[in-house]
Amino acid sequence: MWVRQVPWSFTWAVLQLSWQSGWLLEVPNGPWRSLTFYPAWLTVSEGANATFTCSLSNWSEDLMLNWNRLSPSNQTEKQAAFCNGLSQPVQDARFQIIQLPNRHDFHMNILDTRRNDSGIYLCGAISLHPKAKIEESPGAELVVTERILETSTRYPSPSPKPEGRFQGMVIGIMSALVGIPVLLLLAWALAVFCSTSMSEARGAGSKDDTLKEEPSAAPVPSVAYEELDFQGREKTPELPTACVHTEYATIVFTEGLGASAMGRRGSADGLQGPRPPRHEDGHCSWPL
């Protein structure tokens, strides 16, 4: 009932004020009321990447996002811009703006930072419709320190070159310790084999030479046995001769004659009396 009693003139006045001040229409489209840029302090080493985040409560395609840097004279220098869904570096391609999937946050990256990148950075939003308006976030400072060399305090490990040299030295020593005995063993086996082969060859050669030289070195005397004449005659069997029958006559003398005769016979045949018959005379009987 009370609403019906509100005069239309008052309602119209409120709408006009809201339109002029942007309380109802321009505020939803104005991102600068919730524009943030963090972290407020960022320290990185030279060569690393630095990342800031710019957040907007409401984003529309009519807005343009700028990434600025304050100069020593407190003037803003544009580094990159994001418009129509694209990152547009101004001078240095190391400055990039990436829109996150939630479409309200933007990562502003500096790749491969340098010492002269240190300074104060901020982001700014520009609204072109219905009126051109610019709003900037508070500044955040970036400090780029000297390049940090990798040390072995946290993860102690020898440098690659000494390690490689040490490993090479160990491998060389082990190879020498293993290779030298193997070479000596092979040399010894080869020497034994060669000496055995040479001795066998010499033994076989000496045997062959002995067999070849034996007929001439120790000749066997050969004697030609010839039969002598007298040996031939002795060996020739004589045929038994025919027995010659000899007749003897006995002469009887007187005593004187007999004595002389006997004396003569004795002188002829000896003192032993008449000679007995010999075997060579055959089977001759004494003469009658």
Swiss-Prot record:
Membrane-spanning ranges: 170-190
Glycosylation sites: 49, 58, 74, 116
Effect of deleting the gene: Mice grow and develop normally but exhibit splenomegaly, selective augmentation of IgG3 antibody response to a T-independent type II antigen, and enhanced proliferative responses of B-cells and myeloid cells by anti-IgM and granulocyte colony-stimulating factor stimulation. Mice are prone to development of autoimmune diseases. In a C57BL/6J background, mice spontaneously develop lupus-like autoimmune phenotypes, characterized by proliferative arthritis and glomerulonephritis with predominant IgG3 deposition.
Modified residues (Phosphotyrosine): 225, 248
Motif (ITSM motif): 247-251
A Gene Ontology BP annotation from the UniProt entry: adaptive immune response
Presence of keyword Cytoplasm: no
Sequence motif ITIM motif, residues: 223-228
Topology of the protein relative to the lipid bilayer: Single-pass type I membrane protein
Organ and tissue specificity: Thymus-specific.
Chief place of localization: membrane
UniProt biased composition (Basic and acidic residues): 277-288
Cytoplasmic side of membrane: 191-288
Gene3D superfamilies, sorted: Immunoglobulins
Signal peptide feature range: 1-24
Topological domains, Extracellular: 25-169
Chain positions covered by the region annotation Disordered: 263-288
Keyword Flavoprotein: no
UniProt GO cellular component terms: external side of plasma membrane
Record note on modification: Ubiquitinated at Lys-235 by the SCF(FBXO38) complex, leading to its proteasomal degradation. Ubiquitinated via 'Lys-48'-linked polyubiquitin chains. Deubiquitinated and thus stabilized by USP5. Tyrosine phosphorylated at Tyr-225 (within ITIM motif) and Tyr-248 (ITSM motif) upon ligand binding. Phosphorylation at Tyr-248 promotes the recruitment of the protein tyrosine phosphatase PTPN11/SHP-2 that mediates dephosphorylation of key TCR proximal signaling molecules, such as ZAP70, PRKCQ/PKCtheta and CD247/CD3zeta. Phosphorylation at Thr-236 promotes the recruitment of the deubiquitinase USP5.
Pfam families: V-set (PF07686)
Localization, UniProt: Cell membrane
Self-association state and partner proteins as the record states: Monomer. Interacts with CD274/PDCD1L1. Interacts with CD273/PDCD1LG2. Interacts with FBXO38; leading to ubiquitination and degradation by the proteasome.
Function: Inhibitory receptor on antigen activated T-cells that plays a critical role in induction and maintenance of immune tolerance to self. Delivers inhibitory signals upon binding to ligands, such as CD274/PDCD1L1 and CD273/PDCD1LG2. Following T-cell receptor (TCR) engagement, PDCD1 associates with CD3-TCR in the immunological synapse and directly inhibits T-cell activation.
Protein name per Swiss-Prot or TrEMBL: Programmed cell death protein 1
Annotated source species: Mus musculus
Encoding gene per record: Pdcd1
